[in-house]
């Protein structure tokens, strides 16, 4: 066993290609175990509220419908762009965090503020780089037919009908959301790690396990807090990504709802959802998201630190 290190805070000691590769590994690992939950979450976010049922029954209803009408493989629709999204996002997030950490360290910011700022910059960078894959994944997951959609055909359709902006629909809102998420996640993560480091020597021996548990849960706690705060913004972004789809009327029984979004920006769509569906609609899929956040964040940070440990041997 090796002693776990905080490679993010010590990123200036890690080569850029190692942080890039470790981030890709962590992203792919996280994606591989959460794809089905991700699909259900996106389906719930894309479906306007109509006599909302309890959160738990919503999840089961969507899952049963997918198995009955589309088959078990439906849970992995959009898996290719989803995997590319996670790999690209993971690589960009961790490598840019390490890079920004290196260049901002000389400014001598207070440790928690430093983590918050670096996390925000890392979030913006990773969002821009990976966003087209996010749009593709949302469009493919929205397909509720038995047959799968062609990725290349969807790319051509977006390019033909919407142009380059189509691949970045909702990206400004996404950068705001993801920047906030990254800031909260990394800020919480580093705050807990710093707290544990500072109290390690003064903590009584019989309470060491509590500190160790908190230390190992830092990434998960940060991910959960960030998800709860930013989930409504993510729901609005999903609606924006799907609203101009060529297959909107074919894949959704609520095309008129999406039609009412035409010409609206992020804030107006959010207000429209609040007015027509209520605040609970902005949290459709939150239980799935939180269930996904725990393994995703844990595997992401664990995978990154583990990969960095072994890459340092070479």
Swiss-Prot record:
Q: Name one GO biological process term.
A: transmembrane transport
Of the GO CC terms on this record, one is: mitochondrial inner membrane
- Transmembrane stretches in the record are 14-30, 84-100, 116-136, 170-186, 217-233, 285-302
UniProt cross-references to PROSITE patterns, sorted A to Z: SOLCAR
Where is it located? Mitochondrion inner membrane
Q: Does the keyword Transmembrane apply?
A: yes
Q: How does it sit in the membrane?
A: Multi-pass membrane protein
| Expression induction | Expression is regulated by carbon source, with very low expression with succinate, acetate, ethanol or pyruvate as carbon source.
Solcar repeats located where?
14-103, 110-195, 210-310
- Record's InterPro entries? Mit_carrier, Mitochondrial_sb/sol_carrier, Mt_carrier_dom_sf
Q: Which Pfam families match?
A: Mito_carr (PF00153)
Q: Which UniProt keywords apply?
A: Membrane, Mitochondrion, Mitochondrion inner membrane, Repeat, Transmembrane, Transmembrane helix, Transport
Q: What protein family is recorded?
A: Belongs to the mitochondrial carrier (TC 2.A.29) family.
Function description: Mitochondrial transporter that mediates uptake of thiamine pyrophosphate (ThPP) into mitochondria.
In its UniProt entry, what is this protein called? Mitochondrial thiamine pyrophosphate carrier 1
Q: What is the organism of origin for this protein? A: Saccharomyces cerevisiae (strain YJM789) (Baker's yeast)
